[in-house]
From Swiss-Prot:
Reactions it catalyzes: (5Z,8Z,11Z,14Z)-eicosatetraenoate + AH2 + 2 O2 = prostaglandin H2 + A + H2O; (9Z,12Z)-octadecadienoate + AH2 + O2 = (9R)-hydroxy-(10E,12Z)-octadecadienoate + A + H2O; (9Z,12Z)-octadecadienoate + AH2 + O2 = (9S)-hydroxy-(10E,12Z)-octadecadienoate + A + H2O; (9Z,12Z)-octadecadienoate + AH2 + O2 = (13S)-hydroxy-(9Z,11E)-octadecadienoate + A + H2O
Keyword Lyase: no
Annotated signal sequence range: 1-17
Active site, per annotation: 193 (proton acceptor), 371 (for cyclooxygenase activity)
Gene symbol of the encoding locus: PTGS2
Organism of derivation: Gallus gallus
GO biological process: cyclooxygenase pathway; prostaglandin biosynthetic process; regulation of blood pressure; response to oxidative stress
UniProt cross-references to SUPFAM superfamilies, sorted A to Z: EGF/Laminin, Heme-dependent peroxidases
Protein's recorded name: Prostaglandin G/H synthase 2
Quaternary assembly: Homodimer.
Function of the molecule: Dual cyclooxygenase and peroxidase in the biosynthesis pathway of prostanoids, a class of C20 oxylipins mainly derived from arachidonate ((5Z,8Z,11Z,14Z)-eicosatetraenoate, AA, C20:4(n-6)), with a particular role in the inflammatory response. The cyclooxygenase activity oxygenates AA to the hydroperoxy endoperoxide prostaglandin G2 (PGG2), and the peroxidase activity reduces PGG2 to the hydroxy endoperoxide prostaglandin H2 (PGH2), the precursor of all 2-series prostaglandins and thromboxanes.
């Protein structure tokens, strides 16, 4: 009697094992909901589609699909016909109309309010209200699904170390054909680590950056306690020290604001700033120093305009101005460079005042993952007339004092960064960080690359060859994954065929741009109630934001106003390069991969 009962129980368990939503049947952003153990229902509400799996377009959806050009066609138009775009850029009405469309079409792809997180694959108050989570643009794959990608692919994913070594690890440095430089590389790291701050004690789905956007906590500290330690408490300024007549961050001893430094770093080189990991490399501390100087400079401007204001009002208003400067620089310099567009992007919050737009943001785990642009890093770092290896560069703030910011800016502006897409360009020094990106994606149960492409209105790849644009890697990937619909998001982004002459492939741009623009324009200062001169101390403060640029930031805060940009500048042929890789320094005994641990896993 026991045997038939056990058999029946096993059959029932087997019958209940596979969640019908594991096959991801609902298309076009339809929501899959189970109705019993073996049935599902697709909610097609407001998708523009109908039918059992939300696959039949409504009339206007069909018309839109017929008329809408592909993302690659749009990209081609925007990156060619320079003469036409020069005319459009000088006609305000046309430029504003196109910019408004760019902002709305991109940002409307982001769910706002947020919907899912790594623990909730369905809408819940917890997923909406708990700021300690990163949100998710697609729900995690169910624990009870037959394969890690739902029903597609093999039951076990290939070894992540093998994926890194076979497809991601650099053999020879591949420069970015778009001309991106190291100045851009460190700006990207510095800027994004105000909102990419994974709480590794809780898990990869959690964040310590509760502001979920551009709040400059990497300058001012994540908590009020840290902020107060960094503040001078006079004239709104941040604490600083003067070295050889120039302003630098204070030391940890001066602020008592803890930073992450190895024990060997001398006390006088333990600079203290808002983000505790920014002592990792001098490039990050360079930008931290520039923004420290900019904050204190703007405080002086406001103090002159408002001698009646106390320390708190000067500090808070300056912070809002620097948030505005940051967003302006990111859109008009940083995103402009990445896009490669001849169309001139514009930061103007008023473009959205008559649009359906929510002034809130929640950082997505997928956005954090795709931003792991380790291929940008060069093999060595060239500053003035010297060359530093990773070992010599890590936790070495003496480089900044030895060369000064002017030489660092000049040198980083001339040095080429690496191409991100196309595979095989992650430096060996950070291969463990790339492996961690894959492992954490698996822990959070990301859906496949193709599911993310569909989520962001892209056609899924039909083969590995279509993904990579070549045969060798494609064949090896097919052998390991078995099915293109089982290809993982992060490795897929890095091995994808780059667009012609570009740093990224199609997927990175079409997924990353919506997250980026929604996060920037969804900032509180861009809302109608905030975007007015009085918020920023009057016309003078408003003017600082509206005229901000990377070059102006450097000119106002770096001695000699060195010329800079986010693309490679022609080197001056008069300077010889000395390789210091054989010199005896305290940094030689450091293993860089040991230093790139949890606290810096996103750097």
């Amino acid at each position: 009697m026991l045997l038939p009962c056990a058999l029946l129980a096993a059959l029932l368990a087997a019958g209940h094992a596979a969640n019908p939503c594991c096959s991801l049947p609902c298309q076009n952003r339809g929501v899959c909901m189970t109705t019993g153990f073996d049935r599902y229902e697709c909610d097609c509400t407001r998708t523009g589609y109908y039918g059992e799996n939300c696959t039949t377009p409504e009339f206007f959806t069909w018309l839109k699909l017929i008329l809408k050009p592909t993302p690659n066609t749009v990209h081609y138009i925007l990156t060619h016909f320079k003469g036409v775009w020069n005319i459009i850029n000088n006609i305000s009405f046309l430029r504003d109309t196109i910019m408004r469309y760019v902002l709305t079409s991109r940002s409307h792809l982001i769910d706002s309010p947020p919907t899912y997180n790594s623990d909730y694959s369905y809408k819940s108050w917890e997923a909406y209200s708990n700021l300690s989570y990163y949100t998710r643009s697609l729900p995690p794959v169910g624990h009870d699904c037959p394969t890690p990608m739902g029903v597609k692919g093999k039951k076990e994913l290939p070894d992540s170390k093998l994926i890194v070594e076979k497809f991601l690890l650099r053999r020879k440095f591949i420069p970015d054909p778009q001309g991106t430089n190291v100045m851009f590389t460190f700006f990207a790291q510095h800027f994004t680590h105000q909102f990419f701050k994974t709480d590794h004690k809780k898990g990869p789905g959690f964040t310590k950056a509760y502001g979920h956007g551009v709040d400059l906590n990497h300058i001012y500290g994540e908590t009020l306690e840290r902020q107060l330690k960094l503040r001078l408490r006079k004239d709104g300024k941040l604490k600083y020290q003067m070295i050889d007549g120039e302003m630098y961050p204070p030391t940890v001893k001066d602020t008592q604001a803890e930073m992450i430094y190895p024990p060997h770093v001398p006390e006088h080189l333990q600079f203290s700033v808002g983000q505790e990991v920014f002592g990792l490399v001098p490039g990050l501390m360079m930008y931290a120093t520039i923004w420290l100087r900019e904050h204190n400079r703007v405080c002086d401007v406001l103090k002159q305009e408002h001698p009646e204001w106390d320390d708190e009002q000067l500090f808070q208003t300056t912070r809002l101005i620097l948030i505005g400067e940051t967003i302006k620089i990111v859109i008009e310099d940083y995103v402009q460079h990445l896009s490669g567009y001849h169309f001139k992007l514009k930061f103007d919050p008023e473009l959205l005042f008559n649009q359906r737009f929510q002034y809130q943001n929640r950082i997505a785990a997928e956005f954090n993952t795709l931003y792991h642009w380790h291929p940008l890093l060069p093999d060595t770092f060239q500053i003035h007339n010297q060359e530093y290896t990773f070992q010599q560069f890590l936790y070495n703030n003496s480089i900044m004092l030895e060369h000064g910011l002017s030489h660092m800016v000049k040198s980083f502006s001339k040095q080429s960064a690496g191409r991100v897409a196309g595979g095989k360009n992650v430096p060996a020094a950070v291969q463990k960080v790339a492996k961690a990106s894959i492992d954490q994606s698996r822990q959070m149960r990301y859906q496949s690359l193709n599911e993310y492409r569909k989520r962001f209105m892209l056609k899924p790849f039909k083969s590995f060859e279509e993904l990579t644009g070549e045969k060798e890697m494609a064949a090896e990937l097919e052998e390991l994954y078995g099915d293109i619909d089982a290809m993982e998001l992060y490795p897929g982004l890095l091995v994808e065929k780059p667009r012609p002459g570009a740093i990224f492939g199609e997927t990175m741009v079409e997924i990353g741009a919506p997250f980026s623009l929604k996060g920037l324009m969804g900032n509180t200062i861009c809302s109608p109630e905030y975007w007015k001169p009085s918020t920023f101390g009057g016309k003078v403060g408003f003017e600082i934001i509206n005229t901000a640029s990377l070059q102006k930031l450097i000119c106002n805060n770096v001695k000699g106003c060195p010329f800079t940009a986010f693309h490679v500048l022609n080197p001056e042929p008069t300077e010889a390069t000395i390789n210091v890789s054989t010199s005896n320094t305290a940094m030689e005994d450091i293993n860089p991969t040991l230093l790139l641990k949890e606290q810096s896993a996103e750097l």
